[in-house]
Regions:
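Conserved HGGG/HGGXW glycine-rich cap/lid loop of the alpha/beta-hydrolase fold
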Residues: 5-54
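Active-site signature of alpha/beta-hydrolase-fold catalytic machinery across serine-
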Residues: 30, 96-100
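Active-site loop/oxyanion-hole signature of alpha/beta-hydrolase fold enzymes
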Residues: 33, 42-85, 240, 244
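Gly/Ala-rich beta-loop-alpha elbow adjacent to hydrolase catalytic centers
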Residues: 86, 90, 94
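Flexible "cap/lid" loop of the alpha/beta hydrolase fold
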Residues: 99, 104-137
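Conserved alpha/beta-hydrolase catalytic His-Asp/Glu region
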Residues: 119-124, 136-190
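Conserved loop-alpha-helix segment in the C-terminal half of the alpha/beta-hydrolase fold
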Residues: 195-232
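Catalytic active-site module of serine/aspartate enzymes centered on a nucleophile-bearing elbow/loop
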Residues: 217-255
Length: 255
């Protein structure tokens, strides 16, 4: 079972946070601080991240399916279906899990979902890029922290959470497991049967074309002036859309 971290009142409506590549449950500090007074906030460490199990040969041979099944097991263990809030790689796994097992999900909030391209093995250029990126944190990442303070508008808490995850990444997953399988983003979005808010940067390269999204349960919002990490780049825009959506999903049950 994946490591699961919790904040807030266990009797409150549940949110499940699912992080992206090279991050962990520790990568949501501002969201946790904002939501934990109203909701039971849970956050997973995906396999090979944080303190969750590492990868083995069998799991790597079917990495996308393994990650989806990991998430479905977590969802099945919860007392009631949560609103799932997910980013990038976590967004893709949450999208696929929500399409396959809508009985386990109350609603979805997806942030710039990683777009699968139909590949069944890691791209060498991507592996090299990620290895170099993670190598920059071998000394604790002080230079990377300072770079983000100069170049981004992220809060200090978000920068520290983002940087602190890197040393816990299973490098074997980076080298052998970073492929996403079937190019099913649009078809999965249009199969969803749960309310879904899908946020992405207007000038990004991973979101579906709005004309392709025909599912009336899915609201795709393209946001100006942000990059891949929408909630960090523009928390006001992110929460202005996400918080009312969560409240509506729970029928205003959040406290």
């Amino acid at each position: 079972m994946l490591a699961l971290h919790e904040w807030g009142d266990p009797a409150a409506p549940a949110l499940l946070l699912v992080h992206g590549l090279t991050e962990s449950a520790a990568a949501w500090p501002d969201a946790v601080a904002r939501w934990s007074s109203r909701y039971h906030v849970l956050a997973v460490d995906q396999r090979g991240h944080g303190v969750s199990p590492r990868w083995d040969d069998e799991a790597l041979a079917r990495a996308p399916q393994t990650m989806q099944e990991d998430l479905e097991r977590v969802l099945s263990s919860l007392a009631e279906p949560p609103v799932v809030v997910a980013h990038s790689l976590g967004g893709l796994m949450s999208l696929r899990a929500g399409a396959a097992r809508p009985d386990l999900v109350r609603a979805l909030v997806l942030e710039d979902v990683a777009r699968p391209t139909g590949h069944w093995g890691p791209a060498p250029w991507f592996v090299e890029h990620q290895e170099r990126f993670l190598d920059a944190f071998a000394d604790g990442g002080a230079a990377e922290r300072e770079r983000m303070r100069r170049e981004s508008s992220w809060s200090d808490a978000e920068i520290e959470g983002w940087a602190g995850c890197k040393g816990q990444v299973d490098r074997r997953y980076i080298r052998e497991g970073t492929y996403l399988g079937e190019a099913d983003l649009v078809s999965a979005v249009n199969r969803l049967t749960v309310p879904t808010l899908y946020l992405a940067p207007r000038h990004g390269d991973m979101a579906p074309d709005p004309s392709e999204v025909t599912n009336p349960l899915v609201r795709l919002v393209l946001i100006d002036g942000v990059g891949h990490c929408v909630r960090r780049d523009d928390p006001e825009a992110y929460h202005g859309l996400v918080d009312p959506f969560i409240e509506k999903a729970f029928g205003n049950a959040g406290r």
